[in-house]
Amino acid sequence: AEAGVSSVLGQGGGVEEVLAMFFVNELCRIVQGMHEAGLIHGDLKIDNCMIRADDVDEWTSTYAADGSGGWAAKGVTLIDFGRAIDMCCYPPDQRFLADWQPGAQDCVEMREMRPWTYQADYYGLASIAHCLLFGKYMDTTCYVNDDGLKTYKIQQSLRRYWQTDLWTRF
């Protein structure tokens, strides 16, 4: 059975933090595997994530990252590879520029018309995590330090009872 990840979001809020961690962990593993194979999805967003919740005879209540105990039947499947890029077809130092009008869902490099590669997927992962936690799309604010270095931060505050160290580093 599959459903869109966005369908599990509550009204006005996200999902429980532990469920968000599970989905984000699964997505990180998928994206890491894709990147190791030289693939960029290019359009990671919550609408392109499907929940994988197949029935299993025995399913342990303790998560097993290796998929044992029925966990291989639970997780996330990515869809919509319309913007995918096979980096094996390009020189190792190849970078890209957006040839469309980038929107808020696109990475900062695209919006600022700067070269990008895997940043598109990392921004997408952060955006999905944000949507799972807060129940809405990510808005960022740009800060420029005295040296001209830009940093971007989400506009929402993390809840004090969340694993803030984990999410801040993410």
Model feature map: region roles:
Residues 1-18:
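Conserved structural core of kinase catalytic domains
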Residues 7-11, 94, 140-147:
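Short, flexible/disordered intra-domain loops and linkers
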Residues 23-24:
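Activation segment signature within eukaryotic-like protein kinase domains
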Residues 29-39:
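Protein kinase catalytic-loop region centered on the HRD/HxD motif
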Residues 112-116, 123, 127, 133-170:
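Helical subdomain adjoining the active site within ATP-dependent kinase catalytic cores
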